[in-house]
Regions:
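Intrinsic disorder/low-complexity signal
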Residues: 31-33, 100, 155, 174
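Glycine-rich phosphate/pyrophosphate-binding loop
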Residues: 1, 10, 135-177
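Low-complexity, compositionally biased segments
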Residues: 34-37, 92, 104, 159
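Aromatic-residue hotspot detector
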Residues: 22, 27, 116, 162-163
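A short, conserved alpha-helix in the catalytic core of glycosyltransferases
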Residues: 2-53
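Active-site-adjacent helix/loop segment of glycosyltransferases
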Residues: 45-139, 144-151
Length: 177
């Protein structure tokens, strides 16, 4: 697997420290995905134990409809992509992401969620402001990466596969990498 939810994630302390742990700048959204991506790119295996039972109160930090939650999800995922995407992939990924973000903002507007639409724009603005601060982290992540590709990373967008290609299960997506 590429990542595991922070609600049920175990990482050895030495390994956690080695990869820099959770990014404190991500507060409450996507920090575990970012860390797992760094773990995976440095050759660590992430495993799932399907027999596990976990109880988690999702959305306890921020309500699902909260513009702050929308802001953090969009900003943090942009920063995560910037921090971890290979140089060869970054421009392509960000170009697609640009359009997907504005489609999402338009959808929020059409649904009457004006503050969530604004949050998407604000997240993009914050990403561009924070990008120079994250450049050293990106450099370190790419330098310490031991894998040229991560098999679990999808080549195409999961969002496009779901909405445009009508792929409703992960198994239905044939070419993940």
């Amino acid at each position: 697997i590429l990542w595991a939810t922070g609600a049920c994630l175990f990482v050895r302390t030495a390994t956690y420290k080695e990869v820099g742990g959770l990014d404190a700048g991500f507060f409450a959204h996507q920090e575990e995905v970012d860390m797992c991506w760094r773990l995976r790119s440095r050759g660590y295996r992430l495993v799932c134990v399907p027999q596990s039972i976990v109880y988690h109160v999702g959305g306890a930090t921020l309500n699902a409809e909260s513009p702050r939650k929308t802001f953090l999800n969009f900003r943090n995922s942009l920063l995560m992509l910037y921090k971890n995407s290979r140089e060869a992939d970054l421009k392509h990924v960000m170009r697609i992401r640009f359009w997907l973000d504005y489609i999402a903002a338009a959808k929020f507007l059409m649904e009457g969620h004006i503050q969530n639409a604004k949050a998407v724009y604000e997240a993009r603005k914050a990403y561009h402001q924070l990008k120079p601060e994250y450049a050293p982290k990106r450099k370190e992540n790419l330098e310490k990466s031991t894998l040229s590709t991560i098999p679990e990373l999808m080549r195409d967008s999961l969002i496009l596969a779901f909405y445009l290609k009508r792929k409703r299960t992960f198994k239905a997506i044939k070419d993940r990498r």
